[in-house]
Amino acid sequence: ADDRNPLEECFRETD
């Protein structure tokens, strides 16, 4: 998700 959106990766990690 980092390649498309760094924020999305953060949200997905905190689920």
Swiss-Prot record:
GO BP, sorted A to Z: apoptotic process; killing of cells of another organism
Q: Supply the alphabetized keyword list.
A: Apoptosis, Cytolysis, Disulfide bond, FAD, Flavoprotein, Glycoprotein, Hemolysis, Hemostasis impairing toxin, Oxidoreductase, Secreted, Toxin
What are the names of the required cofactors? Answer: FAD
- The answer on whether this UniProt entry bears the keyword Oxidoreductase reads yes
Top enzyme category: oxidoreductase
As one GO molecular function, the record gives: L-amino-acid oxidase activity
Source taxon at top rank: Eukaryota
Where it sits in the cell: the answer is: Secreted
Q: What is its EC number?
A: 1.4.3.2
Give the record's GO CC terms: extracellular region
Record's keyword annotation contains Flavoprotein: yes
Q: Where mainly found?
A: secreted
**Assembly, per entry:** Homodimer; non-covalently linked.
Please explain the role this protein plays, according to its UniProt record: Catalyzes an oxidative deamination of predominantly hydrophobic and aromatic L-amino acids, thus producing hydrogen peroxide that may contribute to the diverse toxic effects of this enzyme. Exhibits diverse biological activities, such as hemorrhage, hemolysis, edema, apoptosis of vascular endothelial cells or tumor cell lines, antibacterial and antiparasitic activities, as well as regulation of platelet aggregation. Effects of snake L-amino oxidases on platelets are controversial, since they either induce aggregation or inhibit agonist-induced aggregation.
Which protein are we looking at? Answer: L-amino-acid oxidase Bco23
